[in-house]
Regions:
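Solvent-exposed, acidic/flexible segments
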Residues: 104-112, 121-126, 146-149, 168-179
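Export/targeting segments at the very N-terminus of extracytoplasmic proteins
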Residues: 48-137
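Non-catalytic cell-wall polysaccharide-engagement segments
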Residues: 33-72, 157-247
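Sec-dependent signal peptide cleavage junction
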Residues: 21-36
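Sec/Tat-exported extracytoplasmic proteins
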Residues: 119-122, 136-143, 183-193
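Hydrophobic core
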Residues: 13-21
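Substrate-binding clefts and substrate-entry loops adjacent to catalytic sites
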Residues: 97-102, 139-173
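Bacterial N-terminal signal peptides that target proteins for export
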Residues: 2-12
Length: 247
């Protein structure tokens, strides 16, 4: 199994755990052992009521969850520390209609506080944000993270196929910018005023098994009924799904 497939499956497993009630979010259960392919419904990865429930966790609860995933941080000298210990200054955000509310500038802010602040500003469940952080760069469970993992934390504007476009100093890079912009995009995907309306709940949609159309071997796609706007938002953000063999 490729690293790419393993990472996608890890993200799907995390989604099932966080949203499907298979195990509690703060349990020390191994996600791979908890995942059963028969449980995965590509048309209902998460309900709207869960996805947009931004008040599910306090800062302390988020911090305890991060602590539980990396009991021992093994960051290299000169490299970034683990997410549980990570702190940074955050700049003020003016907010944008249909995406996120304004946020003030802060000094020396923990990752848990950033996740909490962004979840409340953008009205997205903090569990969703943590799942996407794990799916995109593996930050939740990274004991020795790289600078790039923070630069492209939520994968916003940083496609796997072109990592070079996710440059230093950009207004979209870094943990805070990635969370704020990425969460805002997830919120915008559910706004009927936006341009992302082609995946319609209650209709059959076709989603590819692999995002790159330029591969020499085509991987095909799966057709299924879309059952929630939140699931549509996830497919807009990450437009592929695992096949049965991968599950």
């Amino acid at each position: 199994m490729s690293k790419f497939t393993k990472r996608i499956l890890a993200g799907i497993s995390a989604l099932l755990i966080a949203f499907g009630g298979i195990v509690a979010l703060d349990e020390q259960t191994d996600s791979a052992s908890a995942l059963n392919g028969n449980m995965f419904d590509p048309g209902l990865i998460v309900s709207d009521s869960v996805f947009y429930d931004f008040g599910t966790m306090t800062v302390d609860e988020i911090q305890r969850f991060l602590d539980s995933k990396v009991p021992v941080c093994k960051a290299n000298d000169g490299g970034p520390t683990c997410l549980r210990h990570y702190k940074m200054d955050t700049q003020a955000k003016a907010g944008e209609a249909g995406r996120c509310d304004p946020l003030p500038a802060k000094k020396d802010v923990s990752a848990a506080q950033i996740i909490f602040d962004v979840a409340n500003a953008c009205k997205i469940n903090p569990r969703v944000l943590m799942v996407v952080l794990q799916k995109e760069q593996g930050l939740i469970q990274a004991s020795n993270p790289t600078a790039y993992m923070y630069r492209a934390a939520l994968g916003y504007g940083c496609p796997d196929s072109k990592p070079e476009i996710c440059g230093k100093g950009s207004t979209i890079t870094g943990l805070f910018n990635q969370l704020y912009r990425g969460a805002g995009q997830l919120q915008w995907y559910g706004d009927p005023r936006g341009s992302f309306t082609y995946l319609k709940v209650g209709t059959n949609i076709s989603v590819k098994y692999y995002p790159d159309d330029n591969r020499s071997v085509k991987c095909g796609s799966k057709t299924f009924m879309l059952k929630s706007q939140a699931t549509a938002a996830l497919y807009y953000y990450t437009p592929y799904t695992p096949n049965e063999a991968a599950l």
